[in-house]
Amino acid sequence: MNKLELQKIANEVRKGIVTSVHSAKAGHPGGSLSAADIYTYLYFEEMNIDPQNPDAPDRDRFVLSKGHTTPGYYSVLAQRGFFPVEDLVTFRHVGSYLQGHPCMQHIPGVDMSSGSLGQGISAAVGMAISAKLTNDDYRVYTLLGDGEIQEGQVWEAAMLAGHRKLDNLVVIVDNNGLQIDGNIADVNSPYPIDKKFEAFNFHVINIDGHDFEQIAAAFKEARETKGQPTAIIAKTIKGKDVSFMENQASWHGTAPNDEQYAIAMEDLKKVEEALCQK
């Protein structure tokens, strides 16, 4: 799949994010939009998965550690064929299987229930250790928020991953620079993120999280890295491609009203039109 095809899918993922949060009148659009390109590459290029057989023993595993950003997660799962795209409008509705945090018992393609920040990476480390103990070839991927890494449990898990030399584990940090309280550097700065992971024996790669060429190169490098887990620090834009949401902490956990929804969808339509002209 080429760069343009991936960009078009990522734009569809972003449409699903905006649509689901608007329908629910609740949710977390900012950090979902910032991670849409990472989600797209993982599910359409990187991971060994089969939507027709989501529990295949040899599948790669993904853990959404920043579990509140389900609008992006559900949107890419729907685009990949795990369930109908039309179901996204039931997000957070009473009786829907698509609730605010992912549930592995109810949603096809979800490998781990998550939500409490800091816990997802621990589950991912456990999965990676399990694969090593059973000599299985599957790889484990986990997506963290940059605000999330203020949680101490993240670093306990990172310490163990580095100690166990889990080269089948890839940690991705969505570094959009903002959390619900504002700029992460002002709230409780985790910088330098790369040096912290290096201190725990991680191979670290810094990338532009919206550049598919850099994303592809990073995951290729991670596959070639032996004897160390990999941390990909992806610099991203919170609210990416929605004009009034970009780089605004206020859109961490706010749903657009009808007027804002129309503007957001028009923004994404313009992105689509620009991509179609390439």
Residue ranges of each PLM-predicted region?
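N-terminal hydrophobic or amphipathic helices/low-complexity stretches enriched
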Residues: M1-V13
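Short acidic, glycine/serine/threonine-rich loops at helix termini
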Residues: Y74-S75, C103, Q153-W155, D181-A185, ...
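Glycine-rich beta-alpha junction loops
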Residues: H68-T69, Y73, N176-G177, D211, ...
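N-terminal capping segment at the start of a domain
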Residues: A10-A26, D174-N176
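Glycine/aspartate-rich loop-and-adjacent alpha/beta segment that forms the canonical ThDP
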Residues: F212-K278
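Short secondary-structure boundary/capping segments
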Residues: R80, V187, E246-S250
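Cofactor-binding active-site loop characterized by glycine-rich and histidine/acidic residues
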Residues: I17-V21, S32-H163
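Thiamine diphosphate
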Residues: G109, S113-S116, I121-T225
